Amino acid sequence: MNRTTPDQELAPASEPVWERPWSVEEIRRSSQSWSLAADAGLLQFLQEFSQQTISRTHEIKKQVDGLIRETKATDCRLHNVFNDFLMLSNTQFIENRVYDEEVEEPVLKAEAEKTEQEKTREQKEVDLIPKVQEAVNYGLQVLDSAFEQLDIKAGNSDSEEDDANGRVELILEPKDLYIDRPLPYLIGSKLFMEQEDVGLGELSSEEGSVGSDRGSIVDTEEEKEEEESDEDFAHHSDNDQNRNTTQMSDEEEDDDGCDLFADSEKEEEDIEDIEEITRPKRNGPTSFADELAARIKGDAVGRVDEEPTTLSSGEAKPRKTLKEKKERRTPSDDEEDNLFAPPKLTDEDFSPFGSGGGLFSGGKGLFDDEDEESDLFTEAPQDRQAGASVKEESSSSKPGKKIPAGAVSVFLGDTDVFGAASVPSLKEPQKPEQPTPRKSPYFPPPTGLFDDDDGDDDDDFFSTPHSKPSKTGKVQSTADIFGDDEGDLFKEKAVTLPEATVSQTDENKARAEKKVSLPSSKNLKPSSETKTQKGLFSDEEDSEDLFSSQSASKLKGAPLLPGKLPTSVSLFEDEDEEDNLFGGTAAKRQTLSLQAQGEEKAKASELSKKKASALLFSSDEEDQWNIPASQTHSASDSRSKGESRDSGTLQSQEAKAVKKASLFEEDEEDDLFAIAKDSQKKTQRVSLLFEDDVDSGGSLFGSPPTSVPPATTKKETVSEAPPLLFSDEEEKEAQLGVKPVDKKVESAKESLKFGRTDVAESEKEGLLTRSAQEAVKHSDLFSSSSPLDKGTKPRTKTVLSLFDEEEDKMEDQNTIQAPQKEVGKGRDPDARPKSTGVFQDEELLFSHKLQKDNDPDVDLFAGTKKTKLLEPSVGSLFGDDEDDDLFSSAKSQPLVQEKKRVVKKDYSVDSVKNQKHPETIQGIKEKGIWKPETPQDSSGLAPFKTKEPSTRIGKIQANLAINPAALLPTAASQISEVKPVLPELAFPSSEHRRSHGLESVPVLPGSGEAGVSFDLPAQADTLHSANKSRVKMRGKRRPQTRAARRLAAQESSEAEDMSVPRGPIAQWADGTISPNGHRPQLRAASGEDSTEEALAAAAAPWEGGPVPGVDRSPFAKSLGHSRGEADLFDSGDIFSTGTGSQSEERTKPKAKIAENLANPPVGGKAKSPMFPALGEASSDDDLFQSAKPKPAKKTNPFPLLEDEDDLFTDQKVKKNETKSDSQQDVISTTQDIFEDDIFATEAIKPSQKTREKEKTLESNLFDDNIDIFADLTVKPKEKSKKKVEAKSIFDDDMDDIFSSGIQAKTAKPKSRSAQAAPEPRFEHKVSNIFDDPLNAFGGQ
């Protein structure tokens, strides 16, 4: 049956069964004969059950939510009640405190009266009548005192009650408090300052006298009434009256609160009327009050007259006190309204003090807490509060409150309440206000500024101001900071950064704040600095909150920076660069920023210490950072700060003297653009970058160098083969060819880093590259041995010195741009492809700002010096180093391509332009042709500068003519040096170029030596323009870069004219004139073999460093070494060799230059390819082979550089030797190099000094080179990574030197530490030998 039943049930229900949920009963019955229908029914059942459960759950959830809400509401109400009690307690406490002085006696008597009242209920009942009467009278008094009755003025006491009532009903106008109580004197006015009562006392006293007169009349009557009244009743009435007084005063307050202004006149008049009215009603109470007053104060009547004036007589008569209190209180109310209105505040002392103090407090916010109700004038609110509290108190603490309610207490209470309350109010309001001012400035600025990680800038802002002292030690250890290491800088910065980091972090914040409100930032500097001083260490909350990311970033940067320092040493490693091209650059930048901040701060400190300009630098740097920060702030605060700092450091140092504003703008814009983008990217990457860079430390800088190599490549590519290189590397960049500097740097960066993945980023990187390259320069400067700071300083000085003498303006531009470019190139060759790009881009930025006047973006290289020297150098530098850097960076990613490129670039720095070895010979030819154009272009934007500034270029060449020499501080000396040493290298033509192109070739020695001196910071003049141009350049970059290309073409023709006459081939044959020869060859499109050779030679020298001499201002130094510098740069490229050779070269400029020129090829096989390119017209294949085959490269460099054969031979020989020796040499040389400029400032000050002796020539060179080596110092880490990346071959060496090595080279120009960094880089890369140079660089 069971089965049947279920089946039957299922059968009939079969259709519904699977469509409807089954009941449990059905399921049970079907359990024996389970069917698909049963499954369907069960499913339906379960679904329904589930839905019910869910719906029930939702209902329960809603109920729980409702319960939670109710609980919260209850809790809120409970807290509200609790707070109400607290407020009541506080109010009473304040009032009691305030009133205690006045009310003590009355309170005691009131208590006595209370006891009496308690004793006799009849008395209490009797007292109620007076109290009621008082309440009525108070109400009438309020009406009369606070309001004017149009019908009757408050003088008619006869019909006052009726009139008062009628008035209340009919016409009541609030009295103008200020009729009887004129406003107190304006705060700050003479009367206000001169008179203690500030205009309140006299009126208050008059009012008091009026009140006292009225009071005396009333009092006499009241006294008579008091005599008639019983004492007990008097006491009770007194208490009642006090209560009533409280009530009335409350009513008065309410009315007064409403009609605070109407109080005084009418109050007084009404008080008289009310007093008269009250007298009849109050006969008992008034008598009691008078009796009490008489008893209390014997002469109640006499004092009653005075009472209004002396609140102390408040006890005298509760009635009278009420009146007077009213008057006073009304005045209080009036005064509340007119905190300053003296008339009614009978307690002038209190009124002026309470009201005055309170008034002022009210202004301060003293009364704000209590007086928050309505009036600025605390007393009105407080009278109200007092009234309210008086009411509460009158009920709660009648005796104490009564008296407070009483005019005396209330008024004094108000006054004191305001004094006390006002003080708390003051504290509270002031706290909010003070924090608000601070935080508002901070937060509003920090909000945008610091959110962005302008912490770095902020750091500099506040850090510089604050850290300047902190960094004085750093400044002190500029050698340490810069020379000692980035590590030192960072260690100092990291170590000092703990302090400095705290400072910087705080300064970041503070700076960020400064930046935030640039206008405010100066203001904030005081306050921020005050805060920063707090905030630096104490106010970090604000600063950190504002700049926490910066702080974190900075703290990260500080720790990471030390970590990165080693990494930074390998700063320009391609891996890291590539990986961190953007990330790394960002990291680098931030690290650079951190380093730069630390170093620049230190540098700023140094500079501040060393110069007023330094102060400008420090201060301006802060300011600069402020502006750049504020501008860059949102976009790329940290990076832009870092770069702003970096480039701005150079710029600001240079621009210091020249342009603060421009500095800021320059930094801003350059960094804004360069860093802004980088910052955006790198800000994001900052932590990663730092982490990445921590990993790739060098990459930190390496990445920017990676960016830098692209930038450098851009320049070269732009210069030489924007199409070719960028055809090869990026047709975009070829398209960008005009903007190649920008784009190429970017695309080179991208190619290197992203393989041109991000053109936008590339652009940003281009921008970044400029800034980043600057930053990288700086970063490389920092990286090398914080060459940035050193480099910046040296650059500022070295570069400045390089450019200082003749090219302070242009030099500043060039120094910042060229030096930065050169540094970027010297460094950036490894680290500074970006920097070169930065210089191109930044120089475009700088130049465009700087060189809007010096139209050529490439003031750096386009400047006459740069244009001539640097153009070739730029081409070579960028071709070699930048391409190398590009390729070093790219190398990390595409070692072969980049190496090829680098090698190609390295081969012919112009080959870098030819670099597109796919386009190799064509590239060389084109680039040979282009090189005339592009050398300038490659020079960066040098043609830009050269051509755009044709006028400017004349200028810039005149200035820049100085600049390349100045850029080649040692190049100047090197020019001297190179002339002897590099006459072999066709340095004469080089020098012609330098002399012509670098008009300040003479200055170069001076510049190199003198101009590079740290005491001679780079002038910010050019930088200012560069900054302005730079920001505009961001928009203008492409056009200007195109213009630069056109100018490069034009300039190349000019350069060809100039440089062809200068024997580009001869120079290249010499191999010495890598800058000159390079450029001439670049320019000398006529002889493609020459051009190729020139390119190769230029590439070799560029990579070698002599070529960099021109193109890389650092290389200009290198160039200045021309080949000696080539050693630096070739060594720099090779950097272990090159640097060692270079250092040796500096030591032995002539022999070493030759050797080092040889060594750089040895040192950098990329150079070898470069040199093969130099040696062989068709060394493009060699470039490719050389870049790829080490031997070919080595061999080629020898042919390329016959003079350089020694150099290259040395470099080749020394490459192995110099890899070991060069590492040592690099250590010593780089140290010396660094010692000379950057390392003198930075890591290797002692060596630098030694080098400076040797390097007097090299000083110029090494002003750049020092920066270069500063970068080299930083570079070593990159090198080690490059080593890993590019380690396999000297191609890697060369390429890595150029890729890394060029980055190293680029690093040379970049910081001129780039060489130092490339050296270490090379060390890492080529062999661990270069690790020694790292160690040699003071552990850099």
Swiss-Prot record:
Task: Quote the subcellular location field of this record.
Answer: Early endosome membrane; Cell membrane
| Record key words, sorted | Cell membrane, Endosome, Membrane, Phosphoprotein, Transport
Q: Which residues carry this modification: Phosphoserine?
A: 157, 159, 204-205, 209, 287, 394, 396, 538, 543, 618-619, 727, 751, 786, 801, 873, 876, 1053, 1086, 1113, 1178-1179
Q: Which organism is it from?
A: Pongo abelii
Phosphothreonine PTM positions: T330
Encoding gene per record: Washc2
Task: Tell me what this protein is called.
Answer: WASH complex subunit 2
Biased region (Low complexity) positions are 201-213, 517-527, 546-566, 1093-1109
Per UniProt, the short sequence motif LFa 9 occupies residue numbers 689-701
- The short sequence motif called LFa 12 sits at 838-846
Organism domain of life:
Eukaryota
Motif LFa 21, residue numbers: 1329-1337
